[in-house]
Structures are given as structure tokens and as C-alpha cells.
Amino acid sequence: MNDLMSQLKSYIPFNEQEKQDKQLIIDQLANAKDIFTRKNKLAHFTVSAWIISPVKNKVLMAYHNIYQSWSWLGGHADGNSNLKQVILKEIQEESGLTDVKFLSDDIFSLEVLTVDGHEKKNVENMFLRTYI
């Protein structure tokens, strides 16, 4: 968790919204209980990844049945504070890929997402950390 906090603190936001999201995520990570599980009804961590072909001319997306739309791959931390492990597991589960190389270990983007229109809604927000 200390590594994640360090990454969050050193992350340079892309815009004002991401700056606000970053501060909220840092505050919640420092103070909230169960921030890596769905037990936290206010918010919890999720991860996503942009999967890019080796020659960087294609991306892999997955169809989300609940939202009826295409999206990048990802999922919930489900108690694991090592978000890199979480995204590797999600990539394998959702695509079958096991030989994945990160272009960077740095945070690609941060978002606080509301959970709207989801039939399994049991939380208000998700903290999303994206890898590339």
C-alpha cells in the first residue's frame, strides 16, 4: 500500500478533474477501511489497462454485457492492494493473455467513477488506476 501511496503522490494530473480525483483517492487510501474490497460502500479500488499490440496499431477491448458497450479490460481489487497483480489477473481472465509487458509501471490515468446503470450497484464510486 505504501508503494501505491507513493505512486499516487508523485502522479502529475492531466487536468483539474484528475487533480481533484487524485486528492480524493489519496485521502480515502489514507483514511478509509476496506478500500480494496467491495465492503466499502462509498468507494473502492478498481484497475484497468489499455492493451496495445506489439506494433502499437491495435487495441484490445472487451464487450461489457451489463452496459452493452465496448471497454478496456479491468476489474475490482477484491482485497488485493497490489494493483499490478490485480490487472494481470483481470487481463488473463478477460482475454486469455498471459504474456503481457507494461510500457510503464507509472500510473497512466486516475479517475473517480460513479457507478450508474449497473444492475449489481452496491457502491457509489470506484477509484480507477489505469495501466498501459
Language-model segments: which ranges?
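A structural signal for well-ordered alpha-helical scaffolds and beta->alpha junctions
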Residues: 1, 18, 22, 84, ...
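Generic N-terminal amphipathic, Lys/Arg-enriched alpha-helix
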Residues: 2-12
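Acidic, metal-coordinating catalytic segment for phosphate/diphosphate chemistry
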Residues: 10-48
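A glycine-rich, hydrophobic loop/mini-helix early in the fold
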Residues: 34-69
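Generic structural "secondary-structure junction" signal
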Residues: 38, 47, 72-74, 79, ...
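Histidine-centered active-site/metal-ligand motif
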Residues: 44, 64, 76, 93, ...
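Conserved Nudix-box catalytic region and its N-terminal flanking loop in Nudix hydrolases
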Residues: 55-100
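Active-site segment of metal-dependent pyrophosphate-handling enzymes
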Residues: 96-132
